[in-house]
């Protein structure tokens, strides 16, 4: 019997680790922890382009702590996480969130798996995450939460969202 609070997903394949997931994510718990790598590829993203590797790296990063300036794999900040995820498929993204927002192909609508999403936080600079599916994305949220999955439908993220960049075809 699972005694974890509803906001946590039991990361059963990673003994001793839990991942904080926000935004009502029963879908994501099933998606990530019950064979997501075998799911049908998203339009424009094939297994050859690194989808399976990215999913594996997302799984490995969930629950890791947030440390400013960290690039993984033991800890991450937001742009360090994105850089580390993409390094696994041989792409070298810029180190800073602001710079990640100035490279790649601009995307405003029709987000796809792997798109780097950008947020402008008032008085706190830029924040990045990687879009997964539906409205969900993975990001290094901060010291209290570490690497988590959140929803773009959450009020905070809807207000801060500034667009996305596509690195996968």
Language model features with spans:
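N-terminal export leaders
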Residues: 15-22
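C-terminal segment of N-terminal export signals and the immediately downstream linker at the start
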Residues: 32-60
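Catalytic cysteine-centered active-site loop
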Residues: 64-113
């Amino acid at each position: 019997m699972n005694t974890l609070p509803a906001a946590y997903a039991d990361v059963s394949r990673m003994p001793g680790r839990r991942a904080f997931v926000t935004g009502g994510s029963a879908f994501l718990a099933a998606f990530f922890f019950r064979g997501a790598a075998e799911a049908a590829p998203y339009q424009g993203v094939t297994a050859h382009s690194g989808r399976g590797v990215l999913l594996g790296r997302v799984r490995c990063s969930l629950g890791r702590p947030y440390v400013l300036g960290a690039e993984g794999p033991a800890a991450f900040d937001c742009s360090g996480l994105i850089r580390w995820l993409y390094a696994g498929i041989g792409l070298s993204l810029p180190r800073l969130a602001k710079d990640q927002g100035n490279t790649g192909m601009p995307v405003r609508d029709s987000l796809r798996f792997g798109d780097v999403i950008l947020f402008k936080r008032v008085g706190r600079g830029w924040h990045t995450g990687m879009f997964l599916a539906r409205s969900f994305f993975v990001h290094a949220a901060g010291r209290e939460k570490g690497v988590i999955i959140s929803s773009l439908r959450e009020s905070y993220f809807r207000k801060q969202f500034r667009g996305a960049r596509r690195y996968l075809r």
